[in-house]
Structure formats: C-alpha cells, structure tokens
C-alpha cells in the first residue's frame, strides 16, 4: 500500500470511465526534460476504439513543456508498438531482463 501511495505522490494518473467502470488508464511523470509514460491499459471490450490514443494524447498535453517522452513495452507487443509508432514514438533500445523477457524502449522527441 505504501508503494501505491508513493506513486500517487509524483505521478499523474488518467482514467476513462464508462458506466461507473474504469475501462482505460495511463500514468506519467516528469523527470528533468522527459515525461515517462507507463501502464497504458484499455479493457479488451473497448480496444480498437481509439481510447488508447485519446489517453496518450491527453497525457502528452499535460506534460507539454517536456522535450521528450519515453515508455517501454514487451518486445512481443507488436500491437502496442504499432499504436505508439502511429503517435510518433520510435524504438531506441532493447533490454533483456531474462531469457523470456525483453523490453523495447521507445521515445518521442519534441522539437522546440
């Protein structure tokens, strides 16, 4: 519980609610000139309806004074990779966590 309280102290959490149920969410925080985005989630019944894009556009607009956005996904998350690339994110690093888990890091640079 303390870990959750700590996350709420420095991160912005966004959610989309339909019929009193959270069907999508994303979080982000700023460190120096970078916004780190995490845990974009959309309920399976509501996927492919633009909700993920709406959440990403909104979180980016909240952190509009940064010059870089960064996030990571599992290397096998091709559907998520496509979504992020549509929004201007580009892979810049792959990290091996163990034999079965690789992460792809993506970034979006904002020209000021």
Predicted regions span which residues?
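Acetyl-CoA-dependent GNAT
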Residues: 1-45, 56, 62, 95-97, ...
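Short acidic/polar active-site loop segments enriched in Thr and Asp
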Residues: 33, 67-69, 90
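Active-site acidic-Proline motif in GNAT/NAT acetyltransferases
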Residues: 43-45, 49, 76
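Accessory recognition modules or surfaces
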Residues: 53, 69, 103-111
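Conserved active-site alpha-helix within GNAT-family acetyltransferase domains
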Residues: 53-54, 61, 76-94
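Conserved GNAT acetyl-CoA-binding A-motif
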Residues: 56, 62-74
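Conserved beta-strand-loop-alpha-helix junction that forms the acyl-donor binding cleft
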Residues: 70-81, 97-101
